[in-house]
Amino acid sequence: PDGSFVRARKGSSTIRVDFHGVPAHAGNHPEDGRNAIDAMAAAIPQLKHLASEIDGTAISTGLVSGGTTANTVAEHASVTFDLRYGSDGDRDELIFRMRKLCLTGFADGVTSDLKIESLGPALPLSAESASLITLINRAAATLRLPSPVWAEAGGASDGNELASFGVAVIDALAPSGGLLHNPNKEYLDLATVEPRLRLIEKALELLAAAKTGASPAR
């Protein structure tokens, strides 16, 4: 919402942990059961705490499910996490620690296993991307537009995938807006449409001129 341009993005992965307990009648023989939901409740804060051990990482609890009926000791439970990280190495280390903790277990008689539902790359600032930043700054100066403000974003984009192939990527050059993922309040700042289009056009001219050796249009 502040109109910043993006030079780096955190990666995003989705991890599910399944818990397997033993069902029993909650009234007659609760001692015969092993509650998967209770194990999940104990596991969530322990797993999320792992992010505090690796700078720049975050774990968000997104989905939970479990049980069959209120009077049955829950045999199954599941929690799905969203992971964020600044490098693929941090991602791999975080998942390794989560898996290790799951193998240790969270409650007697309940097993847990970790599954990777999606695995996304981070988008760190590269030397190739830095050259594009210089070009965008030059385009803004040529048009006498405000100097771009560059930031690191927590949200991932398709640019993350492109960057993983060694492509130079910068992001968020489109018109600005805010309140993402809010179906009733997400908005586009119309005042940013024309300046951003001019900036992109000028940047493409400068990029083409750099490739061909021709002078950019004025």
Place the predicted regions along the sequence by residue:
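Metal-dependent amide/peptide-bond hydrolase catalytic core
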Residues: 1-9, 13-218
